[in-house]
């Protein structure tokens, strides 16, 4: 159910603004994709090699077709990167970011073998929640919208029609009593707070009402003259400075799960009927413990809903609140899009299997809760979409991947290729070498690269082999580090930066060297045990690993193997095919491959930035993703943390901890998770220091 008839969406053109123009394979890929979409093809695959500019191609495609677009990514990090790229390419359009708003999430679960019940525990990121509301607000009010989302967009989001029905439309000159408007705000789950003015609250001063919508950072001022809306202004909530005057505004509810008193009463009646039936079933089967457990929990939840309109875990009653039939699919972000939206699935070889697996992973946990009396059977309908339900809700789809999976290849009538890089870089040369003497050969290759100030990645099959190889190379004087699953996210980022800057020359890892590493300084990728068939040595994994050497003019891949497996043959054949095409293109046009120049500070430069200037926010209207969060100087930049703290008084240390804690929350709110993680670690170290100082003075 898409509420497309209830609102008139504003129409603005999609427009790419960039210093670059399509080059390499991009013009042909854009033309083919556009033609096939306009011809009505439902599934199209863009086979784009690493570094060919698939994101830019997607932006130019959106500009060509002029349709609202959902871009799905396999994880939050990649979604954030894509959102930033699209915001740079489409600065005048609404580029939104929609991912799970949990910083931390422990779902409710029950382990029968140990009779252990685990309560739901979570920490919600307010800024991500704002961005989710901003996405639905944009989708319902304008057409020039690109939403970059993780797979969480197929989870229940509340009924879009109820969301629209509860919306308030404000227009200069309209007639409405002030108190009626305030009651509508309360019904939309906004809270009156005349002292602390923040997102999701409103305040009243005579004939002036001010409110901060949950999806905005700026406030809205509504000025009355009697019962007439005299003026509407957008203003800065802190300074009160007016940003612009408005003629008309849509104000949406403070929650996607909005329900009026009548709907809630109907829901409670349905819950009570279901509870009675389920209790009779459990007691009839002699399961008195489960029946008592369910009775206590559900009657408590019902009482909470009657008294305050909500309860812990209210999403488990969403079927009753939405008025859906048993087994029917939930409403999701997809229902907020217009009918003609386009879907782009990035890294489709990863994302498509994720979409298909979400339902079963969720239902197996809930099934246990229902079976043992922790939840009513209707809780099973608080779930993500099944695969077939997902397919029913999407239209034309473009799959992006360097290694498309079997599903998308089977759905598409041939692929659109994009293998020529704008920089002229070609895929690396692949050399297959015997395993006998492989370590000595690898050592010689490493030394040769180190002399040329180039870097090396080595991928192994097991943790023990990685550790042993790292120890061996260290003994031989090689500057080497080991990247493994126990290294936290921030340290992983630092290791990659140190590799690029030349702090060390070799990075050894297992499965951490596939997607997502952009390392132009790496000229050699060594794959040990390349002939051991399996997940880590599949054709897809090998092609992705080979791509790590595709950013360097002299990139090479050495596969150590005693035989050529089908997966190796596939990866070698595909890489050579791309390489031949790239070399021929360069030769024909006289192009010399250019080294990829990427600033090394890209990943960690946030560690040295200062506080946000409030005037920037006012001038820019609202902060874009990627704005600067206040962070401390990077540890080590002017001495270690311990040196900086030498001689500090206990009070000073406590003040510093509080300051860093505030900065950590701001960084998390700005989605700078690596920065927040670093601050968290520094705070932990400081607290240990404070405890030691307190103990010494006691």
UniProtKB/Swiss-Prot annotation:
Chief location of this protein within or outside the cell: cytoplasm
Protein name according to UniProt: UvrABC system protein B
NCBIfam families in UniProt: PRK05298.1, uvrb
Domain Helicase C-terminal residues, every copy: 438-604
Comment text on domains: The beta-hairpin motif is involved in DNA binding.
UniProt record similarity statement: Belongs to the UvrB family.
SMART domains the UniProt entry points to: DEXDc, HELICc
KW Ion transport (keyword) present: no
Keywords associated with the record: ATP-binding, Cytoplasm, DNA damage, DNA excision, DNA repair, Excision nuclease, Helicase, Hydrolase, Nucleotide-binding, SOS response
InterPro entries: Helicase/UvrB_N, Helicase_ATP-bd, Helicase_C-like, P-loop_NTPase, UVR_dom, UVR_dom_sf, UvrB, UvrB_inter
Entry binding sites for ATP: 48-55
GO annotation terms (biological process): nucleotide-excision repair; SOS response
Compartments, as annotated in UniProt: Cytoplasm
Domain UVR: 654-689
Role according to the record: The UvrABC repair system catalyzes the recognition and processing of DNA lesions. A damage recognition complex composed of 2 UvrA and 2 UvrB subunits scans DNA for abnormalities. Upon binding of the UvrA(2)B(2) complex to a putative damaged site, the DNA wraps around one UvrB monomer. DNA wrap is dependent on ATP binding by UvrB and probably causes local melting of the DNA helix, facilitating insertion of UvrB beta-hairpin between the DNA strands. Then UvrB probes one DNA strand for the presence of a lesion.
SUPFAM superfamilies: C-terminal UvrC-binding domain of UvrB (SSF46600), P-loop containing nucleoside triphosphate hydrolases (SSF52540)
């Amino acid at each position: 159910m898409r509420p497309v008839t209830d609102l008139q969406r504003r129409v603005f053109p999609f427009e790419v603004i960039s210093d670059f123009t399509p080059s390499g394979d991009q013009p042909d890929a854009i033309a083919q994709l556009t033609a096939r979409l306009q011809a009505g093809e439902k599934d199209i695959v863009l086979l784009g090699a690493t570094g060919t500019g698939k994101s830019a191609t997607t932006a130019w495609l959106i500009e060509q077709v002029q349709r609202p677009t959902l871009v799905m990514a396999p994880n939050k990090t990649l979604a954030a990167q894509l959102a930033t790229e699209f915001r740079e390419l489409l600065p005048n359009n609404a580029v939104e970011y929609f991912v799970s708003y949990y910083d931390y999430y422990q779902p409710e679960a029950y382990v029968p073998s140990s009779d252990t019940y685990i309560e739901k525990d979570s920490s919600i990121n307010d800024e991500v929640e704002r961005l989710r509301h901003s996405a639905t607000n944009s989708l319902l009010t304008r057409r020039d919208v690109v939403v970059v989302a993780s797979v969480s967009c197929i989870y229940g989001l509340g009924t879009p029609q109820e969301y629209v029905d509860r919306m308030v439309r404000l227009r200069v000159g309209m007639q409405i009593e002030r108190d009626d408007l305030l009651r509508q705000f309360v019904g939309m789950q906004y809270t009156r707070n005349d002292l602390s003015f923040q997102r999701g609250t409103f305040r009243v001063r005579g004939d002036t009402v001010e409110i901060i919508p949950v999806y905005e950072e700026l406030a809205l001022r509504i000025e009355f003259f009697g019962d007439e809306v005299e003026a509407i202004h957008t203003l800065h909530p802190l300074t009160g400075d007016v940003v612009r005057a408005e003629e008309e505004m849509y104000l949406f509810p403070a929650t996607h799960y909005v329900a009026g008193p009548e709907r809630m009463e109907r829901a409670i009646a349905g819950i009570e009927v279901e509870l009675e039936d389920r209790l009779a079933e459990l007691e009839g089967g002699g399961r008195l413990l489960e029946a008592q457990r369910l009775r206590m929990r559900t009657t408590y939840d019902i009482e909470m809903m009657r008294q305050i309109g909500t309860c812990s875990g209210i999403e488990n009653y969403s079927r009753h609140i939405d008025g859906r039939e048993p087994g029917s699919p939930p409403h999701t972000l997809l229902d907020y899009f217009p009918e003609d939206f386009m879907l782009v699935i990035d890294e489709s070889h990863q994302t498509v299997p994720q979409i298909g697996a979400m339902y079963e992973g969720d239902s197996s946990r809930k099934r246990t809760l229902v079976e043992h009396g922790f939840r009513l059977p209707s809780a099973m309908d608080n779930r993500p979409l099944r695969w077939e339900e997902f397919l029913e809700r999407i239209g034309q789809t473009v799959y992006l991947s360097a290694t498309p999976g079997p599903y998308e290849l089977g759905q598409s009538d041939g692929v659109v290729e994009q293998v020529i890089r704008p920089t002229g870089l070609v895929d690396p040369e692949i050399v297959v070498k015997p395993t006998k003497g492989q370590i000595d050969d690898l050592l010689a290759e490493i030394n040769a690269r180190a002399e040329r100030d180039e870097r090396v990645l080595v991928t192994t099959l097991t943790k023990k082999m990685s550790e042993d190889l790292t120890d061996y190379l260290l003994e031989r004087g090689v500057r080497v580090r080991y990247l493994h699953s126990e290294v936290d996210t921030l340290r992983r980022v630092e290791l990659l930066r140190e590799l690029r800057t030349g702090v060390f020359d070799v990075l050894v890892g297992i499965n951490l060297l596939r997607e997502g590493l952009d390392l132009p300084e790496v000229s050699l990728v060594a794959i040990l045990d390349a002939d051991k068939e399996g997940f880590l040595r599949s054709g897809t994994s090998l092609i992705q690993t080979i791509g790590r050497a595709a950013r360097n003019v002299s990139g090479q891949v050495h596969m150590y193997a005693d035989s050529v497996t089908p997966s190796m043959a596939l990866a070698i054949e595909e890489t050579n095919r791309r390489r031949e095409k790239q070399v021929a293109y360069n030769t024909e046009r006289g192009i010399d491959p250019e080294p990829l120049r990427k600033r090394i500070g890209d990943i960690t430069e946030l560690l040295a930035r200062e506080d946000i200037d409030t005037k920037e926010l006012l001038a820019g209207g609202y902060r874009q993703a990627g704005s600067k969060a206040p962070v401390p100087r990077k540890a080590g930049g002017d001495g270690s943390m311990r040196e900086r703290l030498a001689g500090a008084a206990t009070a000073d240390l406590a003040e510093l901890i509080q300051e860093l804690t505030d900065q950590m929350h701001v960084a998390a709110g700005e989605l700078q998770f690596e920065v927040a993680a670093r601050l968290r670690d520094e705070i932990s170290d400081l607290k240990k220091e404070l405890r030691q100082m307190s103990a010494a003075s006691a």
